[in-house]
Amino acid sequence: KRKAGKTDELTESIHYGEVSAFITEFIKSHTYKLLERVAEELVEDMLQKFDGLEKVTLEIQKPWAPVGLPLKTVSVRITRSWHTAYIALGSNMGDSRQILDDAVSAIDALPASKVEKVSGFITTPPYGVTDQPDFLNGCLRMKTLYYPKELLRELNRIEKEAGRERIIHWGPRTLDLDIIFYDDLISQEDDLCIPHVEMHKRSFVLEPLEKIAPYKRHPGNGKTVRQMLEELTDS
């Protein structure tokens, strides 16, 4: 940790002895076939166990592995870190406030994830298909060890458990969860675009997002959330 290096304060550092003991106990108490699995599980547990640990590079070596070659060791080396994601939430069916509260709790309960901040919920008119009830919308900020596709899969599962049915595009829904930002990633795939491709056009996303991240910059257009909201409001 940089602060420990600048202040020489032990309390600002990660306790190396505790980390070493944790690794030793993990290796003793777990059995896996692949080094890759050992590395992934150990790093994930370390990041969740030790507060202030943001990124880990880990190498696991296996001496004299049976690979049919005169090698002293084979190894797996990985780097994993916490990521920051912003999620938009919406509902216009059932008890929407309870549904959104439950969704926040479900996201916070995900393994390898922590909800850090939640906006208030706002009531907004429907977008696209207008012949339907008003929506309740909000946004949250979370830390996660999931990669984008993994996070999307978990959000889709939470939607489904809340009764989400994908029948009418932009139609009524019990729960809608969208990844708006994921770090400063720019990615466009058939099933997932980050940042969300329509976010700059949607006041129901920008208004609650501005409450928790006014100065977060869009990695594509360079504008802050507040700037995008002001431009949309003025248009």
Which residues does each PLM region occupy?
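N-terminal, polar/charged subdomain of small-to-medium soluble alpha/beta proteins
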Residues: 1-85
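Flexible, gly/pro- and Lys/Arg-enriched active-site loops
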Residues: 2-3, 8-9, 127-134, 146-152, ...
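A generic structural signal for short beta-strands and their flanking turns/coil linkers
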Residues: 54, 72-74, 111-117, 134-138, ...
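Extended accessory regions or peripheral subdomains of proteins
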Residues: 84-104
